[in-house]
Amino acid sequence: MEDYKKRIKNKLNVVPMEPGCYLMKDRNDQVIYVGKAKKLRNRLRSYFTGAHDAKTTRLVGEIRRFEFIVTSSETESLLLELNLIKQYQPRYNILLKDDKSYPFIKITKEKYPRLLVTRTVKQGTGKYFGPYPNAYSAQETKKLLDRIYPYRKCDKMPDKLCLYYHIGQCLGPCVYDVDLSKYAQMTKEITDFLNGEDKTILKSLEERMLTASESLDFERAKEYRDLIQHIQNLTNKQKIMSSDKTIRDVFGYSVDKGWMCIQVFFIRQGNMIKRDTTMIPLQQTEEEEFYTFIGQFYSLNQHILPKEVHVPRNLDKEMIQSVVDTKIVQPARGPKKDMVDLAAHNAKVSLNNKFELISRDESRTIKAIEELGTQMGIQTPIRIEAFDNSNIQGVDPVSAMVTFVDGKPDKKNYRKYKIKTVKGPDDYKSMREVVRRRYSRVLNEGLPLPDLIIVDGGKGHMNGVIDVLQNELGLDIPVAGLQKNDKHQTSELLYGASAEIVPLKKNSQAFYLLHRIQDEVHRFAITFHRQTRQKTGLKSILDDIDGIGSKRKTLLLRSFGSIKKMKEATLEDFKNIGIPENVAKNLHEQLHK
């Protein structure tokens, strides 16, 4: 047993059966996951025993040690978990990777405030209103307010009057001493409007329209009329879900097949203006998962706390209140409960859709390999291994192999090869070498053999591979070749002793699968070749610099990875990784010659 596994096993025996938080660390001592538990020992043992889903399996495979912190209660564990996630931002805590950022309208906290549309919420810098369903909706609302209120527009106060002053859309605080009470009144009216109180602004515009009409200024009266209609259109676009205009978020969730879907409805001005959907693989009870989610939703993501948060009645209200500093409502009946139920129903529908898509995807890939086997006259190729070479005029030649199982990439079984015995650009011999090395090892280690081998190339490549398999290794595995057209796209599948074209329709699932395989093996091979060339070029440059031996060369490669990064580095950067000052100066000079 490897040392780290022994250490983990021994440490598990001393973990207490108490509530607390735990931190999983990788080989670099980086925190990769933070979790909480009612009983730490049971939760931590569960990671290292039994079967897991793919995500948890990947996580466990990277764990080299763990730490834990005992707390006095489950509530304290939840609060500590949120703080630890904020501190370390572990990559396996998926909620931190929320890339959904919604637009808000912001009134800045300045002497003469401005109106902005932003996706970034920074507490203490102003008032935020939203979220809006999309940027267009937020921009249209801002444009409307810009036309009605002569609010400051410039980012920095200029030293002279700008265009907005001359067209009546700014009071010119950059030059004139604008009455702050007048500005405060505008801010109040804008705030009321953005909070859903449009009666005040409509009444004001109607009065201005009548005044303009009585003064025979019909052009100005028409402008006010258009603004009134625009406001009415803007506020009536969405179905009214409630006459109560309290700003609230409504949460509902559903659980199935080890997954949890949480739906959030953003209710603003009586309208549902946005919906947020999050899928989470269950790693604790559904209630615990929800408490973690809602705490992160408001503390770690770009979401403004509403006046009310509505949640299902089966949850612990006090637990939620400990991490969400606003009014928590658990409606028992009526329209508000209907909204929570609707959010839960939508979550269930989203989960069902997810599983249906997975099922369809599996059906398509199985159909593709069955069709491929039928057209080639072989058994269904459950396991396919494909090879491609990459080099430039025989320099740094490499090869790569990708594996597809049940029509899907099996990336843990991808392999890279540096060509060892072939001199110069000889694609056929390179392919023979790699196939020989691959399947010699497969036989020696008792690894699974593929049902089909695909090479990127034609008859010459196929014959070379078949010769190695049959005459050197005694294997009888079907070998096919994939050819590309003049646009470098997958064109034909070749198979058989005379490398005949297999009749596949270009719109068939089988052909689509072959296209994916060829693209993937080419991508994998060429990426490896670029990495190899980069390292070779880097080594050759470093070889000519005094004071840089093999150990320092390795250190530089690990620390910077490329010449470009080294050229961007300072003397201090080199010294910080352990390069002596005189060598660092020499290195810096040579790189900038």
From Swiss-Prot:
The UVR domain extends over 199-234
Query: What InterPro entries does the database record attribute to this sequence?
Result: GIY-YIG_endonuc (IPR000305), GIY-YIG_endonuc_sf (IPR035901), GIY-YIG_UvrC_Cho (IPR047296), RuvA_2-like (IPR010994), UVR_dom (IPR001943), UVR_dom_sf (IPR036876), UvrABC_protein_C (IPR050066), UvrC (IPR004791)
Q: Which residues form the GIY-YIG domain?
A: 17-94
Q: Name one GO molecular function term.
A: DNA binding
Instruction: Extract the Pfam families matched here.
Output: GIY-YIG (PF01541), UVR (PF02151), UvrC_RNaseH (PF22920), UvrC_RNaseH_dom (PF08459)
Provide the Gene Ontology terms for cellular component: cytoplasm; excinuclease repair complex
Q: What is this protein called?
A: UvrABC system protein C
The species this protein was found in = Staphylococcus aureus (strain MRSA252)
Q: Which gene encodes it?
A: uvrC
